[in-house]
Amino acid sequence: TAPHGLPELIALAVVTALIFAAPLKAKVWATLAVVAAGALWASATAVGVLAGGHTVRLWATDVFLFGSDAGSMDPLSALFALIVSVGAVAAVLYSRGYLAHYLGRKSPTHISLHYTALATMFYAMLGVVTSEGGFSFLFFWELMTVASFLLILFDAERREVRRAALAYVIMMHVGFALLLIGFVRLDSVCGSADFALLGEYFRTQPALPLFVVFLAGFGMKAGMFPMHVWLPE
């Protein structure tokens, strides 16, 4: 079985090829098609989950990049999937206006990269809210970080933009390292890094160290005080 994570990377390559191949003024519509397809699927699944109050298994594998893992949608993740889907479609539609005056100033490659990052951001966010295990979560978390970095770097000619992007990517990877430490610890104690095992860990192990590691890791992404140094940039 191919490691889960490889199909996502292949899909990302296909999406990138579609957006790059589209004519300059059609890139927004190519991106909208890519995002809307995923948004419709995610929204339909989410509505079914919310209406039925049940959990739907989306994927499962015994061979993830770091071990077995799975993804599912329960009522809470369904709510977030709906929010992400609506927001992503709205963002692509809005981009048609705010990128219009860049079409003659930026190269087609630059515009393509921006739209690829936008589509990648959407699918990575869906992966984040539906991952059952820590390692698949981190895979999508990192994909989301890289996509965000590229979006921030769109106006890279400006020094303040480069500085903001650098501050962001450094803080995000410090946070990623902390989360990785936390999930490795969970996996070493409980035999898996599934979120469902956090309760067992906190019942049987000293809770404060792991809590602090996760708080700092997630806090950096959220821009929580005092880990918000990248946010004003």
Annotate each PLM feature.
Residues T1-H4, V15-T116, S192-E200:
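Transmembrane helix-loop-helix hairpins at membrane boundaries of multipass inner-membrane proteins
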Residues T1-A11, S77-V86, G134-A147, Q205-M220:
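Structural signature of hydrophobic alpha-helical transmembrane segments
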Residues P7-K25, F149-R159:
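Cytoplasmic juxtamembrane interface segments
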Residues L113-T120, A124-P206, M220:
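Alpha-helical multi-pass transmembrane bundles of energy-transducing inner-membrane proteins
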